[in-house]
Amino acid sequence: MTARRKQALAEAGHRWIVSLLLSLLAACASGVLYGLAFPPARLQWLAWVALVPLLLAVRRGSLSAALLTAWVFTVVSSYVTGAWFPRAVSDYFGQGPAMGLAAFFAISTLMGGPGVLAFTAAYRWVARRARPS
């Protein structure tokens, strides 16, 4: 393998990592904004713009990166609305904070994950088919 080819592969890897990090950052921003649209913050108008960064992020990259981005959105938005849940679980069961966080990740993934992941896959499919050739 030539030095030029190795450099091109390294640059492509760096672009992929940067793209994934930007997508995850967009998912976190969307999750926070979407979570603030619900009580206790009650900023309902944010729900209309909260999904824009997420929708832009899942259009680019691979399907696995889009699904990871959607999962991060699910967990972050669930945590913004239910930050009390991990502590309540750990206090109720007499376990440490790690048990509460593990229960939170499991429940937020099981409750919100399938719908968000299915929507993400369908949205990517429609967006790719609607692209002009």
Predicted regions: what they are:
Residues 2-133:
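Membrane-embedded alpha-helical bundles of multi-pass enzymes
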